Amino acid sequence: MSEKMYPIPFKSLMNWVVTEYAREGEIFGVHTPYYASGKTLPIFGERIETPFGPAAGPNSQLAQNIIAAYMAGARFFEVKTVQKMDGAELAACVPRPCILAADEGYNQEWSTELEVPQARDEYIKAWCALKVLSKVYGLGDPDGFVFNMSVGYDLEGIKGEKVDTYINNMMDASETKQFKECLEVLTELFPAEKDYIASISPRVSRSVTVSTLHGCPPQEIERIASYLLTEKRLHTFVKCNPTILGYKTARTILDSMGYDYIVFDEHHFNEDLQWADAVPMFERLQALADSKGLEFGLKLSNTFPVDTTRNELPGTEMYMSGRSLFPLTIEMCSRISRQFNGRMRISFAGGAEFFNCDKLFSAGIWPITVATTILKPGGYNRLHQMVEKVEGLPYHAFSGTDSAAISDMSAASHADFHHLKPIKPVASRKSEDKSPWIDCFTAPCKGGCPIHQDIPEYIELCRKGLFGPALKLITEKNALPFITGTICAHRCQSKCTRNFYDESVQIRDTKLLAAKKGYGALMADIKVPEKVAGKKAAIIGGGPTGIAAAYFLGRAGIEATIFEREEKLGGVPRYVIPAFRICDEAIDKDVALMERYGVEVKCGAPAPSVEELKKCGYTHILIATGAWQAGKLDIPGNVKGVIGWMKEMKTQVKPCLDGHVVVVGAGNTAMDAARVAKRMGAASSTIVYRRTKKEMPADEHELKLAIDEGVNMVELAAPVAQENGKLKLERMKLGEPDASGRRSPVATGEFFEIPCDLVISAVGEKVDAKLMADNGIEMERKGPAFKTNVENVWCAGDAHRGPATVVEGIADAAAFAEAVIGAAHEYDIPETAYASKAEAIAKKGILKMAKDACCEGSRCLDCSTVCENCADSCPNRANVVIKLSDGRHQILHIDKMCNECGNCTQFCPYASEPCHDKFTLFQTKEDMEDSRNAGVLFLGGDKVLVRLADVKEYDLSQQNDLPQEIENLILTVRAKYSYLYN
């Protein structure tokens, strides 16, 4: 495909709008239109019904973008910047992809990619459409919104014929061909509104925001603003760059908030507008505006230039936005507000979103424009929630900004969850699969779970208070609901789509809630099945993997026996993991659940050998003995292995420590050990790691808990020797990435010491190689193969993988059970476990932090019912939802509306690019030839051109070899969505 997008002719655009609204009650993917409350705010001699809108950028470039934003509640539109360079010349300077908004935002966009006259026409089309839609559909006052021009980048270009004509036409569009066409089309569509349509004001905009390039001299900025105020008599905002804060301030703020990896140097700070020049210039411009009876203010802020160092986007420089920009922007606001005693009007853009928009508005900062937040899942729908949040606040004319409140906001932002970067880099939320053309909706949490739990379904059952059915559904795949509900590493949560909104659904907590509330009913309903003849399984090891294997076998009627050397089942969770993380009661309940199926348990003695077990009639044997041998830390001194030491700490009646404890290693077990040492009275507890916190294998949550409890962290250090109350360490530095993707530690030859009386080695536990050798089992790198070289002997969990997670052990246990049983476990999911499409769609665009597990059903986005992330996140609306006659939703990509910005790619749960990989609708043969996408071109009548593997012409009235689902999609588009291509 080409990155060139086509403006939609106004008649086609309005046909789309009218048809979609009549049929669905929505427009351009905005599911819940905003109906204005009647309150207004005065600005520029006009009125706006809400203080929000899209910032000049990807969401304000095309008519459909602006209409979508209006439908969601936007009423202040800073339309995309125009300058003398435009069209193909400009587009050639923009690399693709050019937007990355998965976390903090980055972009490489400039001004409009359209030709300036095309951009003008898009804004006129949107203006006229909103004037009528607001009235006809009762969305608000037709005079309740404002269009604000954005122009740049130098006075010569602004005064040139191209941009000058644009400004004049936006100030008075009456003589433009587009304005006249709009009135004709609207009159044809809404004949009852003929007189009103004829009265639509051609004065599209009476205000402007000045955008200049980095390095623009202050004299040039002042000349541009003065020209627009005096010659064009336009209310004027001047956009400022965060560089006005100075390099040291920006670097300090970002570093302190976890953005130390963002690279930039001082040159923009030195070349951009300086504070000493800015203040007197703004005073002069304010006085000039006052003398002309016009409004003047500042737009804070522009995006922030940073270096491209991690292949985030093509090219060498990109522009930062979103949550990392907010602390810089609000600090700019604070300094401006104080400097001008609250008299300077501030228009805000720079990380505004739901969680801070009310504070900004209450402090007198408005209008508030957004970009990054509405580029994420939920898209334009996010505006509706923002509008509702401020509706209850007082609306009044601008009377000044609250300097104290803004200063408080600035200080608070440095510790605000919504703006802080996690300590550890966020893992990819994508699966390894490619998106199918049809039925692509999937729940990424399921894919992130080693046992593929039915997560949205059991959360929905919990939402409905059906805890018994929820736990029954959980235990279809998960034999340990209490253990996993307490200490599961919950990889599912790192995949959760809600991470793109606020924070993940608390899946583990919800599982534990179901376990606690549904346990009694589940136990009462269990019936021991009849035993299967001819099969008998021995399980060596009574940890989580062994318990899970016994559960799955017992449920299927397979006679099974667990052999455990300790006095009780539970393995590492019972004997090693500290009680402050998991209590024995939780383990006991999972054990009782397994025993309910009649499994035999033999504790307190080593298991017989494999050969002896076979002689006793066991047909299938599982070794699930864990990885209890300490990893070797080859240094002299007082060193203990973490597993043995933690078992000692847990089993002692009143363990007590003194002196300084150092834990070497940085996995979850290391964090547990360090926390145990701290709680047991150690003078200090310290983690020593060869890399930095970012590379630590421990879960982010476990790392934070250790830090919060006062555990010291010594990064980039390797132990050398412990003696005389000290641990000698060698400083390390990070070199090139190793096979794990983490940068390898490299010795520097520099040494230092820290207090240390005891070293705990937590550098990776090992499988008992002697046990394997004694039974003739061959070892691989970490342990034996799952199905070992010995007939009918399997190895699972830590004994197979090396140190692994509980849920990975359950996955191995299930695979072993399936091998023994000879068939996969089958079960039904009750209909009550599925949210309706309407319920799923209603959650889109709603940001909401977790409170407790009972609330999580309202936060789960039901991705397997409705995903549509690519449709939400496309600013141009180029990924549309097609509703088939059977109720299923499908995604169709519209080639002519896409500029290959790449934003949709970030939010697709597959390893796919929707703009390239979804079935595509083409407008012309040339477009189809210029693309590699699978898709369709309607040729007229029943004839279509379709590319799957090859391009082929089909007659839809005849039998053909098109896949049925593809043909069904094409026929639906022709029957119900012809406005997409006509």
List PLM regions with ranges:
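Glycine-rich phosphate-binding active-site loops on the catalytic face of alpha/beta enzymes
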Residues: R75-G87, C240-P242, K359-K389, R691
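Rossmann-like dinucleotide-binding cores of NAD(P)H-dependent redox enzymes
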Residues: E559-I562, E566-V601, A674-V720
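Ferredoxin-type iron-sulfur electron-transfer modules and their immediate structural context
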Residues: E317, R323, L328, I374-L375, ...
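N-terminal capping/small domains of soluble enzymes
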Residues: M1-E231
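Rossmann-like dinucleotide/flavin-binding elements
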Residues: I540-T561, K602-E611, T625-L633, W645-E700, ...
